[in-house]
Design a protein with these regions (language model features):
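A conditional alpha-helix N-cap/helix-loop micro-motif detector
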Residues: 61, 133-137
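Catalytic core of membrane glycerolipid acyltransferases/transacylases, capturing the structured
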Residues: 33, 73-134
Length: 285
């Protein structure tokens, strides 16, 4: 139906109407306002302390971190970890968070994870939403701003959680984001860092072990010599190769049973080891 806007010359009220095409789908309002994509200055320190010194040491039996010297202390960084469990987002800050670099991590998460009470918590802990099918311009701009500020961003390149321990097909978004930002602002020096996370159990339970291996950075500037689309595919292929190498090394370590171990014996108190050159304080239980 088509109606027109008209005003009566005798002072009567206006009649305002518009044409509405029933076949046109209007875009929904953003589910999460951009202004809410901020880390809480009070919640983050509390949650980080609880996770690092209480929750993780109490839950896991053995936490091993290798390669912390590969984490830059400054400059834009994109961590590209394997995705094996919901514990990953707690384990990553433990392995490469503020105790190591003095900065917090930003997480790219799905829109569904930003709803309700969980969403309130996620958004204040560095998470921000992305529509994996149709990324909003605001989200892409936010990523570029994070890179300009020299932040540390976490993107799970596999997308979903895979509990079989194998590296699955990587999404191309992480390479495209890195190269687009580096192309738009030459000299940013974006580094993409492969990270392997492996648990001793597919569904980690109390007393399970976790092995985090951090590889050397992939320099985004090394992929700026040709067509960005082709270079993004090359970066994705190189990232896949590195993640597979890390995962295989972690699998070998996981299959080595310690001497005098017994499946029936209860888990020992959390033993934390780091094989990088950076030594971290270990809380006493």
């Amino acid at each position: 139906m088509i109606k027109s806007d008209s005003a009566s010359t005798t002072g009567h009220a206006q009649t305002t109407s518009t044409y509405v095409n029933p076949h046109v789908k209007f875009p929904r309002r953003p589910l999460v306002a951009v202004r809410n994509w901020r880390i809480s200055p009070w919640l983050m320190p509390v949650a980080y302390f609880l996770g690092r010194y209480i929750v993780l040491p109490s839950f896991f039996g053995h936490i091993q971190v290798t390669g912390q010297e590969n984490i830059p202390r400054s400059g834009p960084v994109i961590l590209a970890p394997t995705h094996r469990s919901r514990w990953d987002s707690l384990v990553l800050p433990y392995a490469a968070g503020r105790h190591l670099t003095g900065r917090d991590m930003q997480f790219m998460v799905t829109i569904d994870e930003c709803q309700g009470l969980q969403g309130w918590f996620v958004l204040r802990m560095g998470g921000f939403p992305v529509n994996t099918q149709r990324p909003a311009i605001a989200t892409l701009r936010h990523v570029v701003k994070l890179m300009q500020r020299g932040e540390m961003l976490v993107i799970y390149p596999e997308g979903d959680i895979h509990r079989d321990g194998q590296v699955h097909l990587l999404k191309p978004g992480i390479a495209r984001l890195a190269l687009n930002a580096e192309s738009k602002y030459p000299g940013l020096g974006i580094k993409v860092i492969p990270v392997s996370i492996q648990y001793s159990e597919s569904y980690p339970h109390w007393g399970a072990d976790v092995n985090i291996r951090i590889d050397q950075p992939i320099q985004a500037r090394d992929y700026m010599n040709g067509n960005l689309k082709l270079e993004a595919k090359r970066l994705t292929a190189d990232l896949t190769h590195k993640l597979k190498q890390l995962s295989q090394e972690s699998e070998v370590r996981r299959n080595i049973e310690p001497e005098n171990s017994s499946p029936a014996s209860p888990p020992s108190p959390c033993y934390i080891s780091t094989t990088s050159r950076v030594q971290l304080p270990i809380p006493s239980d």
